[in-house]
Amino acid sequence: MLKLQLSNGQIIEVEEGSTLLPLAQKLSDKYASPIVMGLYNGEECDLQRPLTADGTVDFVEVNNSVGMRVYVRTLLFMLIAATKKLYPDVHLEVRNSLGSALYCKDNSERKLTAEDIRSIEEYMHKMAERREPIKLLRLPKSEAIDMACAICSDDNLALLAQVPDDTVLTINLLEGVPGYLFGPMCPDAGYVPHFELLPYADGVIINYPDDGSWQVLPPFVDQPRLNDAYQEAEEWSAMIHCNTVGKLNKIIDLGYAEKIIQVAEALHEKKLANIADILASHHELKLVLIAGPSSSGKTSTAQRLSIQMAVNGLRPIAISMDDYYKNRVDSPRKADGSYDFECLEAIDLELFNEHLQRLLAGEKVKMPKYNFRTGCREYRGNELQLQENSVLVIEGIHGLNEKLTPSVPAEHKIKIYVSALTPMSFDEYNRIRTTDMRLLRRMVRDSQFRSHDAETTLRTWADVREGEEKYIFPYQSSADIIFNTTLIYEFAVLKKYAEPLLRAVPQSAGMAYTTARRLLNILSYVKPLEDEVIPNNSILREFIGG
């Protein structure tokens, strides 16, 4: 018998080889939404996975961001299985997120019609209605690879081949269709009743509920410019044969890593030069606003773009939004009483816009400097006056929000959205989430420059994401230009820095430990890459240093 300690301290005994599913069903009335996953000794655990040792047990319900990942993974498997059943010659590839939706590209010669997509959606809803079981198979490596041959690409099979021979792998089955998706799934299709499929571009959109509102299906909001940026990155990475982890590993093994670094950095330089050309062509331009989520590389982008602007004869002048914080005594507070420095109201908008108007009118302005120690703005004699061809460059989370600069007419400003839209994936069904890549960047940067351990970064990440959802993502569609800061090789470089930080997170850290173990599993598939040949002005240097 195995002894399991529940989150309330209760210890129960279960048979070795039993699963968490009966226990989850027994405790379901204590949760506000369905339990979709277990935490077994702090690590993510499928409810149908056999237990083999004593340990601690907790459960994850669907109505949060972690549980919603299980929901979406299950939904993807339902889409794969339904498509295989109805249209065996159709091959879908999971591409990128668009808000609370996923875009899947149809790579087959026989393209899905709108009627085909409706048929697939109806089939999936019938799966949910009859609670079609999703079986979990734990197979030796050789057997798992044999079964995976029917569903996995050569790149994914190469990744499976590199795991130790004694590894037991998980394969799922839905109506006889095998699936190899990284991470736990729901026990049956009935757990995911809320979704819709929509024809989109060269494929289909899977629309599903937002985190925290699992029973509400929001309307799909198209973001064509963002999707175009994703598609451009994916097509470029495929063109240079480096769009999967398996291909990146092969490039590293063959000794071609330096070349791929040079090509990726050259792409950034080319894109920034193109943006600078666009800015130079706007003869009335006076203000460039740069915004993006955490660890998207805003600071390096602003610095490198300023150099390219100078090449075009412009005179970029950086202004820090931090210097326009209200004095701390006047700062807004959160519900818990702590200061809210992320909201727009934390900025002295009246003073900021007054200074903008005076600067654009050619006046000399005494510029403030915010003292974070005292919590007050100070004036240290710094004055600014714009010259001919001067352009203000302002980086900050609210740059896309029109309420930040209502005093500046639209013809005098350009808004740039910066984000790390990674095109890298493991295979056609297992993508690398952009948020995970940004989290790795932030964790490494916090360790290198802020003396924060990984546990601290992981604990605060939810608050960071909440701020992004409030203050950045709602305005990204208003950007005039999107710059993608991802570097196709960075996953392999971040591995060297991130793994020791993640291993140091103790099991007592709760969900921070769970996230650390999940990220370590993702990183285990990529081979490490040294960073000596990465140029000093690379956006990646903002995070790894050097």
Task: Indicate residue ranges for each PLM-predicted region.
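Conserved NTP phosphate-binding and transfer environment spanning the P-loop NTPase/kinase superfamily
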Residues: 283, 405-546
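Hydrophobic anchor at the beta1->P-loop junction of P-loop NTPases
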Residues: 288-290
